[in-house]
A protein has these predicted regions:
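Histidine-centered metal-chelating micro-motifs
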Residues: 66-67, 88, 110-113, 117-123
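Short acidic-glycine-tyrosine-enriched beta hairpin
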Residues: 95-116
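Ligand-binding loop in jelly-roll beta-barrel domains
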Residues: 116-143
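A short beta-loop-beta micro-motif enriched in histidine and acidic residues
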Residues: 46-54, 65-79, 99-100
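Short, conserved beta-strand element in jelly-roll/cupin
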Residues: 58-62, 74-94, 137-138
């Protein structure tokens, strides 16, 4: 192979992560700061290959686990692609209008989208089987992450500080 060909191959290889070969010890255990009973194993694959405007994470959810405190984003799109789902893996959704939380069964190959501002809080839960998925979304300079079951909002400023606000203290204007 020529020197130019070797450089191209090295460049392409720097942009490839072989997720099927990732062992659990390659993934970080992410414990949710708003609800420590929620956690997932995660690798920021988008960061690893140099993405700056889109976040993409490879995630494994062990049996008997909830991935995150149910949430929705005001300014950021969020999506998930189910790589491998066992028989008892679920999308959890919380509808603020009805204040109900529902379980939606997941299957391998499902694609889920949560457009910015859609007031459907979401997360994943497993039973006896594990769940493997890609999770991603836009990286806006400002976002508000709503946690309806906890009664809090996290105001995210990617260029500065974040603020956690209890819903009871939120006053809308306009």
């Amino acid at each position: 192979m020529s020197e130019q060909g070797q450089l191209h191959a090295a460049s392409v290889n720097a942009n490839v992560i072989h997720t099927p070969s990732l062992a659990d010890n390659n993934l970080r255990n992410i414990i949710h700061p708003r609800d420590p009973t929620c956690s997932r194993l995660q690798l920021p694959v988008g960061d690893k290959v140099g993405l700056t405007k889109t976040g993409v994470h490879y995630c494994r959810l062990p049996p008997g686990t909830t991935s995150t405190a149910l949430h929705w984003h005001s300014h950021e799109d969020e999506w998930a692609y189910i790589v491998d789902a066992g028989r008892d893996c679920f999308l959890l959704t919380h509808d603020e209008g009805t204040n109900e939380t529902k379980e939606v069964p997941l299957t391998t190959g499902d694609f889920l989208a949560f457009p910015a501002g859609t007031k459907v809080a979401h997360g994943f839960r497993t039973g006896k089987d594990s769940l493997v998925y890609l999770m991603g979304g836009s990286r806006e300079s400002m976002d508000i992450c709503h946690y309806p079951e906890i009664g809090q909002r996290l105001i995210i400023d990617r260029n500065g500080e974040n603020w956690l606000v209890d819903e009871q203290h939120v006053k809308t204007q306009g």
